[in-house]
From Swiss-Prot:
Pfam families: Ribosomal_L16. It comes from the Eukaryota. GO terms for cellular component: chloroplast; mitochondrial large ribosomal subunit. Keywords: Chloroplast, Plastid, Ribonucleoprotein, Ribosomal protein. GO terms for molecular function: rRNA binding; structural constituent of ribosome. Part of the 50S ribosomal subunit. Gene3D superfamilies: Ribosomal protein L10e/L16 (3.90.1170.10). PROSITE patterns: RIBOSOMAL_L16_1, RIBOSOMAL_L16_2. Belongs to the universal ribosomal protein uL16 family. GO terms for biological process: mitochondrial translation. This is Large ribosomal subunit protein uL16c.
Length: 136
């Protein structure tokens, strides 16, 4: 699972996701990509599940790039705990994703294989997304 080696602070505010993604919204490495259409938090487990699904489907052929990294800690309070006494402890990591952001890129395979692999990865995600092809 992806997570930062070290962070400056253990806990973060939740924040809010306004607007579209202004960075990471163009295909940079591969020929095909999965682009997000709505804002969400994507957990490290979901990123890993999508990556594994794509690599299994493509077998040895093709190369895959993961374009997001979970760098936001999500804290959870223990169950049946009274209110107060501070913020909960960090439980898992998420990547904050806005519309337009590229999640995965792929190359070295045919378009049909890439489309199928990316659709399997898209089904692992909690949000709507679309398949992109690099127009040359």
């Amino acid at each position: 699972m992806l997570s930062p080696k070290r962070t400056r602070f253990r806990k973060q505010h939740r924040g809010r996701m306004k607007g579209k993604s202004c960075r990471g919204n163009h295909i940079c490495f591969g020929r095909y990509a999965l682009q997000v259409l709505e804002p969400a938090w994507i957990t490290a487990r979901q990123i890993e599940a999508g990556r594994r699904a794509m690599t299994r489907y493509a077998r040895r052929g093709g190369k895959i790039w993961v374009r997001i990294f979970p760098d936001k800690p999500v804290t959870i309070r223990p169950t049946e705990t009274r209110m107060g006494s501070g913020k909960g402890s960090p439980e898992y990591w998420v990547a904050v994703v806005k519309p337009g952001r590229i999640l995965y890129e792929m190359s070295g395979v045919s378009e049909t294989v890439a489309r199928a692999a990316i659709s399997i990865a898209a089904s692992k995600m909690p949000i709507r997304s679309q398949f992109l092809r690099l127009e040359i």
